[in-house]
């Protein structure tokens, strides 16, 4: 049987040209009044998926 792409993962994770996986930071969608500006600033931008999770993520994306 063919492997299928896990659509929830596909919406959250992108593969870069060099094959790295990047994702957005969590905790920056709502209820921001209670979070400090330092914290929300730190959560800005995209980060690389942790090395421990990369193999599993690639399998969910149908890349391996």
Curated annotation (Swiss-Prot):
GO MF annotation, one: structural constituent of ribosome
Biased composition (Basic residues): 1-14
Alphabetical GO biological process terms: translation
Highest taxon above the source species: Bacteria
Signal peptide span: none
This protein's UniProt keywords: Ribonucleoprotein, Ribosomal protein
One GO cellular component, as annotated: cytosolic large ribosomal subunit
Location of the region described as Disordered in the Swiss-Prot/TrEMBL record: 1-29
One Pfam family from the record: Ribosomal_L35p
Sequence similarity: Belongs to the bacterial ribosomal protein bL35 family.
PANTHER family reported in the protein's UniProt record: 54S RIBOSOMAL PROTEIN BL35M, LARGE RIBOSOMAL SUBUNIT PROTEIN BL35M
Protein name, as recorded: Large ribosomal subunit protein bL35
Species name: Corynebacterium glutamicum (strain ATCC 13032 / DSM 20300 / JCM 1318 / BCRC 11384 / CCUG 27702 / LMG 3730 / NBRC 12168 / NCIMB 10025 / NRRL B-2784 / 534)
Gene name of this polypeptide: rpmI
């Amino acid at each position: 049987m063919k492997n299928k792409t896990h659509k929830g993962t596909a919406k959250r994770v992108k593969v870069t040209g060099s094959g790295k996986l990047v994702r957005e930071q969590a905790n920056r969608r709502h209820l921001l009044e209670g979070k400090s500006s330092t914290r929300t600033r730190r959560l800005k931008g995209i980060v690389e998926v942790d090395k421990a999770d990369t193999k599993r993520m690639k399998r969910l994306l149908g890349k391996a």
